[in-house]
Amino acid sequence: MNPQDRSTRAYVLVEIQPGKEKEFKDDILSRGLLVDSKEERMDFVHGAFDFVIILCGAMKDIDRRIIEIRKSPFVVKTETLI
């Protein structure tokens, strides 16, 4: 990945259906939506949201992956911070 393509970082806050944490994480990982193991991560959190997903890359690629995250059948809502 070109260093210029990493210039954008997005924090995607995800609320999922109760009890579906494992299914959601497996879904996201199996679809390859985290592409840079050094920069990107998916953390379970407590509070209004269940996961924080950090995405890095070109804005066009981040947009595409956020749309794919939202397509997960376990997602209730998302908030994205860029």
Give the location of each predicted region:
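A compositional/biophysical signature of low hydrophobicity enriched in polar/charged and small residues
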Residues: M1-I82
